[in-house]
C-alpha cells in the first residue's frame, strides 16, 4: 500500500478544497439576488433572434466549420505523432524514419496554424458586420420611439446598449460559439483516442472529471453574480457621466464640484469592486483546474512510470514510454478545453444577458405608429383645426382640457399664457410628438392619425427655444444631410433670416466648425441657424416655440424681421414669451390651465381688458423700467 501514498495525498488535498467550495456554494444558495442573472427571455429565443442576423453570412460560417475540423484534427493527431517519435528515439531507429515523423508533425502544425488564422480572420470580419447590422437596427428603432418613451429611458442607458452590450454580443460570433463547438469536439475526440490507446490511464484521467464538473458549477454561479454586478455598475456610471457631463456648467455655477465628485467616486469604486470580484472569481477557478491538471499529470507519471518499469499489462495493453508522452499531451489538451468551456459558457451567458438588454429596447413598441390605412400627404395648404382635444402626460392630470380652435391656411397664430398652460403641448401634438387621448386634430380637414407620421412631419418646420446643433459645420446643420442643395441657395436662405450677417464674419463661412450642441455660437446665432434650417426645407407649416426667449435686444430685432418675412412662407404657429413679437399675428390664443380663455387680434384682446391685457401691461411696464435704468 505504501506505493499508493502519493495518490492518497493528492486525493486528500482535492477533497479538502472541494469541501470548502461546496460550503461556499451552499452559503449563497438561497440568496436569489446573488445570482443576478435572472432573465425574462429564454436562451433559445435569444439565440434564434441572433441567428437571424447571422443567416446572411451562413456561407462564411460553413467555411469556418471546415477550417475548424483541421484544427480539431491537429489536437487529436499531434500527440500520437509525438508519442511515435518518442518511441523511435527510445529504441534503435533510422534517421529517415525520425525525419519523416518530424516532417509530418511540422506539416500538420503549419496546416493547423494556417486554418486557425483564416478562421480567426473570417470570424472577426463576419462578427463585426453582424454587430454593425444589430447596432444599426437598434439605433433605427430608438429613432422610432415617441418623445414620451425616450423621456423614460436615460441617455446613458441607451449609449450602454448601443456600445457596451453590442460589444459583448460580438464575442458570441467572433469567438464563443465556434470555440464552444471546437472544444466540445476536441474533448470527445481526445477521450476516444485515449480509450483506444490505454483504458487504464484513461480511467485514471476520468476520475478527475467529476471534480471539474463540480468546480465548473460553482464557478458559473459566482461568475454570473460578478458579471451582473459589473454590467450594472457599468450602466450606472455611463448614465451618471452622460447626465453630469452635459450639466457640468450648472455644477460649476453652483459650486457643487466636490459633491458631484463624491457621487462619481462612489460609482467608480463600485465599478472597481465589481471588476475586482470578477477577477477574483477567475483567479480562483483557473488555479483549481490547473491543480487538477497537475494532479492528473502526477498520477500519469506515477502509475504510467510504474507500469512501464514493471512491464505491467492491462487488458492486453502495455504502457510504453511513447504512451506516457502521448497521454501527457492528451491530458494537457483535455483539461485546457474543459477550462475554456466553463469560462466560455459563462461569457456566453453574459453575452446572452447583454443581448436580452438590447432586445428589450428593440421590443419596446413605438407608441406613435402609423395606422394601417395611413395616407401620404403630397401637399399641405396649412389649415389646422383642434376639436375638443384632451391630453395628459400622466393619466388623470389633464394638460389640455377640451381645446378647440381653427387656423386658416397661411395664417399666423400665437399662443400665450403662463408656464404650464399648455402652449408648447399644443405644438407638440400637431407634430404628433405625443398622442392625445380625446378629440381630433385636423390638417386640411384630415385627421392627423390617418396620415403617415413621416409624411406629416415633412411638411412641418419646428423651431424650439433650446436649439440643438450637431457637431459638424454650419452647412451640414442647415441642410441636415439633404444632398443637392447648392451653397447659393443656402446663403440665400441665410440672408432671408438675417443669419448671413454673422456667417460672413466667420473665417470659414458655411464651413465654420460647429462644436458639440453648438456651444461656440450665441443663443441668438443658434436661433437664426434654426430658422435657416427650417426655411430651406420649405415647410408648409412653421412652428416656433419660445424662439425669441433668452436673446439680446439686437438679435431680437433680427429675429422679428425674420419672422415677418417667414409669415409669407406658410402657416405659422408661435408660442411667445415676448408679446412684442406677436402683435401682428392674425389670431392670438390665450391659455390658462389647459383651457382657452380668450382669442383675437392684438388690438381686440387689449380692448377686452382680459388676461392678455394684464400680461401685456406687465411686460410693457417692465420694459419701461428697464429703459429708465
Indicate where each model-derived feature is located.
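A hydrophobic transmembrane-helix motif
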Residues: 77-79, 83, 111, 177-220, ...
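Alpha-helical segments in transporter systems
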Residues: 2-11, 59-80, 84, 101, ...
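Transmembrane helix-loop-helix hairpins at lipid-water interfaces of multipass membrane proteins
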Residues: 1-40, 61-115, 122, 196-200, ...
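Cytosolic ends of transmembrane helices, especially the final helix of ABC transmembrane type-1 domains
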Residues: 233, 256, 280, 289, ...
